[in-house]
């Protein structure tokens, strides 16, 4: 399910966000009004979205983080095709994978999911 279309661009954005978290955000007090934080929101979104469309959603999220916004819980959303039952269970006996994210369907449509990290 992860984004493999442009791994180089995703890797650059992910490395820059992780650098921000490690070197800048660690030395400032926690001030994000949302859960997940804006940097975690960006990392989660980069796993599932095209990096350019993810950057648009990340920019909207950062612009909404201001004193006039009350904040709260705002999970990132993505649009995915639901795999057929045969596709989702074909490697069941061979490969056990660790669950990293839950994709919870939204009420908006059948292809839009909330991304929630386990």
UniProtKB/Swiss-Prot annotation:
It is found in: Cell inner membrane. Pfam families: YidD. SMART domains: Haemolytic. It comes from the Bacteria. Signal peptide: none annotated. It is a peripheral membrane protein. The keyword Cell membrane applies. GO terms for cellular component: plasma membrane. Keywords: Cell inner membrane, Cell membrane, Membrane. Coiled coil: none annotated. InterPro entries: Membr_insert_effic_factor_YidD. NCBIfam families: membrane protein insertion efficiency factor YidD. Belongs to the UPF0161 family. HAMAP family: UPF0161_YidD. Could be involved in insertion of integral membrane proteins into the membrane. This is Putative membrane protein insertion efficiency factor.
């Amino acid at each position: 399910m992860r984004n493999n279309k442009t791994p180089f661009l995703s890797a650059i954005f992910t490395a820059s966000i992780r650098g921000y978290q490690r070197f800048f955000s660690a030395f400032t007090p926690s001030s994000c009004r949302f859960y997940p934080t804006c940097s975690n929101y960006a990392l989660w979104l980069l796993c599932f979205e095209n990096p350019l469309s993810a950057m648009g959603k990340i920019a909207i999220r950062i612009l909404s983080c201001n004193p006039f916004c009350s904040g709260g819980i705002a999970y990132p959303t993505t649009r995915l095709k639901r795999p057929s039952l045969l596709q989702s269970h074909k490697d069941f006996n061979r490969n056990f994978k660790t669950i990293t994210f839950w994709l919870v369907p939204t009420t908006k449509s059948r292809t839009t999911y909330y991304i929630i990290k386990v």
